Design a protein with these regions (language model features):
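Extended amphipathic ligand-handling, pore-lining, and cofactor/metal-binding catalytic surfaces
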Residues: 1-153
Length: 153
């Protein structure tokens, strides 16, 4: 990360009551690991995880002493669709992002987040990540099933 730049990742998350397999905790763990391993300028928030929305992320950024600076936004989703284009980027207007979008909220909070700082590539656009998925699928296909398909539900 270039000095002074802040990198954010937008995950989907699960709304309260729908936290499958404690998946929401993985976003917090990812942020902690990114900060510990690479840079304290990495932050992860979600569209749907209570207590980990963009405003919560901004509060964490400020608490970490990062009250201003250039912010780069990346979707942390397989495909960069509606959430990346609208909830993160806030549309296509350079100077008038949609209210409530990450770009709008970050600029309102005193950060610099122009349209060009919103990367609209999903995880599936990176061959390295797709190769990890393929490896995991291959290993899963070669292992014992985790459940009995014939068992009554």
């Amino acid at each position: 990360v270039d000095a002074g730049k802040i990198v954010t990742f937008m995950g989907h998350g699960n709304p309260e009551g729908w936290n499958y397999g404690n998946g929401n905790s993985r976003y917090t763990m990812l942020e902690e690991e990114l900060q510990k391993t690479y840079s304290s300028n990495y932050f992860v928030a979600t569209v749907d995880m209570e207590d980990n929305y963009v405003d919560n992320m901004i509060s964490r950024m400020q608490a970490a002493g990062k009250a201003s600076g250039d912010v780069i936004c990346h979707p942390l989703m397989s495909i960069a669709g509606d959430h990346a284009n609208n909830d993160m980027k806030g549309g296509v207007s350079e100077n008038d992002p949609e209210e409530g979008s990450w770009r709008y909220e970050l600029n309102k909070a005193g950060y610099t987040c122009p349209l060009s700082n919103c990367d609209i590539k999903g995880l599936a656009d990176y061959s390295e990540i797709v190769n990890v998925w393929i490896s995991h699928i291959s290993a899963a296909l070669q292992s014992e099933p985790m459940y009995d398909q014939d068992a009554e539900e």
